[in-house]
A protein has these predicted regions:
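Histidine-dependent nucleotide/RNA phosphoesterase domain, centered on the 2H-phosphoesterase fold
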Residues: 1-174
Length: 174
């Protein structure tokens, strides 16, 4: 039986802490109708597989990720999708596109936009105001060491992400 799976780059504690500190300075962060995501679960989704078989997806990712290099990333800026506040991701050195393309499901047509979902909210949540307040954020840079295959389950306060597999990334010279 399949489980809900996706691949992602985890956000390291230093980058998450810097963004949390910046959010604490934002007056709009106290808006009603705002639901924060758990910073310990912050990640950059690379590929979403829906209901899938963990062993088969692990084998597929092992082949697809072999020899790929890790770019240097930074959380910077913010934006809004309908009902979602996200932190932007910039590439400081290297390239993220080859990594994202390698793990995207076959036939995926949506454009990849690297981001971290920070909060969700309804019409009174002030997401646009928060995105504006976070526009100047520039967190510390990091080079991801691994891609995670994560299982997503519904929890009482939001999704719960559990690592299924880990895939080490090569280290490119800067």
């Amino acid at each position: 039986m399949g489980v809900r799976l996706f691949s992602a780059l985890p956000v390291p504690p230093a980058a998450a802490d810097a963004l949390r500190a910046r959010l604490a300075e934002c007056p709009a962060a106290g808006a009603e109708d705002l639901r924060w995501t758990d910073p310990h679960g912050w990640h950059i989704t690379l590929g979403f597989y829906g209901d899938d078989e963990p062993q088969a997806r692990t084998a597929w990712l092992t082949r697809r990720l072999d020899g790929l290099q890790a770019p240097v990333l930074r959380l910077a800026g913010a934006g809004v999708f309908p009902g979602v506040l996200w932190a932007g991701v910039t590439v400081e050195s290297g390239r993220l596109d080859p990594l994202a393309e390698a793990v995207r499901p076959d036939g995926e047509r949506r454009r990849f936009r690297a981001h971290v979902t920070v909060a969700r909210g309804g019409p009174r949540a002030g997401l646009d105001e928060l995105a504006h307040e976070l526009a100047g954020h520039r967190g510390p840079a990091w080079r991801p060491a691994e891609v995670l295959l994560l299982r997503s389950d519904r929890g009482p306060t939001g999704p719960v992400y559990t690592p299924v597999s880990r895939f080490g990334l090569g280290r490119a010279l800067q």
